[in-house]
């Protein structure tokens, strides 16, 4: 869990913002949402494979767009 130390004469709002930012970087909220409900292992694998396919298609489209601009 991210820990922040209050600086001298630091407003609470600024400290809260720093804490939220550190939680965001640590991925605590995303992890909590992911673990909120049980997900079957087959569903996890299926979602991971779909994400990999999406990344691959995105990479291919970027390469094709780059080739088109070169001509």
UniProtKB/Swiss-Prot annotation:
GO BP of this protein: translation
Keyword list, A-Z: Ribonucleoprotein, Ribosomal protein
InterPro entries in alphabetical order: Ribosomal_bS21, Ribosomal_bS21_CS, Ribosomal_bS21_sf
Example of a GO MF term: structural constituent of ribosome
Record carries keyword Ribonucleoprotein: yes
Keyword Nucleus: no
GO CC, alphabetical: ribonucleoprotein complex; ribosome
Family: Belongs to the bacterial ribosomal protein bS21 family.
Name under which the protein is recorded: Small ribosomal subunit protein bS21
Native species: Psychromonas ingrahamii (strain DSM 17664 / CCUG 51855 / 37)
């Amino acid at each position: 869990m991210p820990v922040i130390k209050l600086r001298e004469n630091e407003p609470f709002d600024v400290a809260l913002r720093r804490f939220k930012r550190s939680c965001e970087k640590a991925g605590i909220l995303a992890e909590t949402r992911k673990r909120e409900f049980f997900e079957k292992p087959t569903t996890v694998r299926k979602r991971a494979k779909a994400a990999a396919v999406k990344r691959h298609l995105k990479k291919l489209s970027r390469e094709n767009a780059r080739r088109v601009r070169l001509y």
